[in-house]
């Protein structure tokens, strides 16, 4: 289940605590990059994540090349990202290039602010979001990105925005990788417009570690009513562990544990960017849930 579904099941006492199973199996929860800490309830863990989609920066290499600007690094502060987007922007009527693009989801804007590990959307006081909204409103005013109003009115999907070929950078989840690859392969996207692409690590606030990003997870649990709890946990452990992660990666999905084998599998997919920097962007250091428990 996703986190809201997990929360409901925990509150209804329908899930078995996995604490003893995890200890007995010798599972290293650090492999999950902090995700399990965020779904621990009163000191106990009732699920193990097996899938995790996290956010990255997608960029159009042709736009960068045309501007003579180096591709984004895997260690950008928010200030770096804003400055780079402004460098790439061309507001000339009829040949506009947007330095960046933000989809209309709240996640695309306000969750930059949770990457310092000090805040979440459950805080109650949201003053920490102000600098990020201010930055993006300023970008809208200066033509660096399309406005929320225009995007909402037009109903422009993020995939269409990127595939148009006039967006330099876009923040979006890892699920877009397989979409981009398959749509370019099928001819739905024009490869002359967006076929030369790469990914970079998510930009972060000053003081936050490079490779920090926001994530969503899907987890597996053992029901407290199960007559075969040990067998059920064996399955949970396999799917959420390194062997299950390899299988997930081989199908184009992102597992919750990102080992070197997993990264090599994803980076080895036909259509994935061949540059080393894009492969390195698959490494994350801290994952903060969009919706924590």
What are these regions (language model features)?
Residues 1, 14-16, 164-172:
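Alpha-to-beta junction loops
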Residues 25-62, 96-99, 203-213, 286-293:
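A structural signal for short loop-to-beta-strand junctions that line the ligand-binding cleft
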Residues 200, 250-293:
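Long, aromatic- and glycine/proline-rich binding clefts that accommodate carbohydrate-like moieties
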Residues 67, 185-255:
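Extracytoplasmic/periplasmic substrate-recognition and gating elements
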Residues 3-4, 76-82, 149-164:
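Short helix-initiation/N-cap motifs at beta->coil->alpha
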Residues 2-54, 194, 198-200, 272, ...:
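Hinge/lid segment of periplasmic solute-binding proteins
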Residues 85, 121-152, 202:
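Glycine-centered hinge/linker elements that transmit conformational signals in sensory
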Residues 68-73, 137-153, 166, 190-196:
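A local structural motif
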């Amino acid at each position: 289940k996703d986190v809201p579904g997990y929360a409901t099941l925990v509150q209804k006492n329908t899930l078995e605590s996995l604490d003893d199973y995890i200890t007995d199996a010798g599972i290293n929860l650090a492999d999950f990059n902090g995700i399990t800490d965020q779904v621990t309830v009163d000191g106990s863990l009732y699920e193990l994540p097996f899938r995790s989609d996290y956010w990255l920066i997608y960029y159009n290499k042709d736009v960068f090349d045309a501007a003579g600007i180096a591709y984004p690094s895997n260690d950008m502060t928010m200030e770096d990202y804003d400055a780079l987007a402004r460098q790439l922007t061309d507001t000339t009527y009829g040949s506009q290039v947007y330095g960046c693009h933000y989809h209309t989801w709240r996640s695309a804007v306000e969750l930059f602010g949770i990457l310092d590990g000090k805040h979440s959307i459950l805080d109650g006081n949201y003053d920490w979001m102000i600098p990020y909204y201010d930055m993006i409103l300023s970008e809208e005013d200066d033509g660096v990105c399309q406005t929320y109003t225009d995007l909402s009115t037009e109903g422009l999907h993020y995939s269409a925005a990127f595939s148009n070929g006039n967006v330099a950078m876009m923040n979006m989840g890892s699920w877009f990788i397989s979409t981009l690859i398959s749509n370019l392969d099928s001819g739905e996207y024009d490869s002359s417009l967006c076929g030369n692409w790469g990914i970079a690590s998510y930009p972060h606030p000053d003081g936050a570690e490079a490779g920090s990003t926001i994530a969503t997870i899907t987890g597996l649990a053992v029901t407290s009513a199960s007559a075969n709890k040990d067998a059920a946990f064996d399955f949970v452990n396999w799917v959420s562990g390194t062997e299950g992660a390899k299988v997930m990666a081989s199908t184009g999905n992102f597992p919750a544990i990102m080992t070197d084998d997993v990264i090599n599998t994803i980076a080895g997919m036909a259509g994935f960017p061949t540059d080393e920097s894009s492969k390195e962007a698959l490494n994350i250091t801290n994952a903060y849930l969009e919706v924590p428990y």
